Amino acid sequence: MSTNQYDVLVLGAGASGLMTAYMAAQRGRKVVVVEKANKVGKKILMSGGGKCNFTNLYVEPSNFISHNPHFVISALTRYTNWDFIGMVCEYGIEYEERKHGQLFTLKGAKEILAMLLSECEKTGLVDIKTNCEVKAITALDEQGFQIATTLGYFEAESVVIASGGLSIPTLGGSGIGYEIAKQFGHHVYPTRAGLVPFTFSDSFKEVTTRLSGNAVDATLSNDLNSFTEALLFTHRGLSGPSSLQLSNYWDVGQSFKIDFLPTVDLHDYLKAKKHSQPKALLRTLLGEHFPKSVVVE
């Protein structure tokens, strides 16, 4: 079986894989991107509800969770959010700013994927192979690696793991990247869920089930961090941006607090209402801030 020769093999054709391929090709490297799914960029297309939250106006190293903060600083210095925004503007992709500086396309995530593929194509040095699953990687005696795939063998001087995490297996998520990293002596930290809802099995679940579909602004906090955004009640527990963000700083068995009136000093508020509306019922006052079903509960 013949072997295909490349300078760089990128494992995974998601956002990071396509950006890596484009950047390597800009430096004159011949690149092949291998993707086990039948299409590239599936997670890009579903991100942001199909509108792709492609970056943020306020990108700081402190926003990133990493065991190697120095790498985060270096990466964000060498390629900034404004560099990517500039590329988006060059392609005439319209976007909007939402809460907390989040940027979303107006016409859909397909525009971001098309942009990345176009940048790769313009270099003339990037090949993309779909339905191509990596089976084994072997270090060569002289230099580089041999990669066995379902489409044959490849050789490359460098291999980049951009296969993503374990989430959403139906979109191609798998543990192959972790296995390869371990194989070549890299330390792999234990994995755990992140950006996930909180689920409950006790009596509180009965409450969230009854309130399912209601959303309120709230602050969720623990000893490590706090987030003030929308909180969504579901039939299994709590979701919404505030829950998803705090889940990155929470582990099983730990507690967290919920402030349902983060912008209100409750003592001063009730004191003022006592004078302005002395006969008002508590549920009436709470109704100024929460949906009726939440107040009743």
What is the predicted role of each segment?
Residues 25-49:
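Glycine-rich FAD pyrophosphate-binding loop
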Residues 72-80, 99-118, 129, 168-172, ...:
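Short beta-strand to alpha-helix junction loop
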Residues 130-143:
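A conserved short coil-to-beta-strand element within the FAD-binding core of flavoproteins
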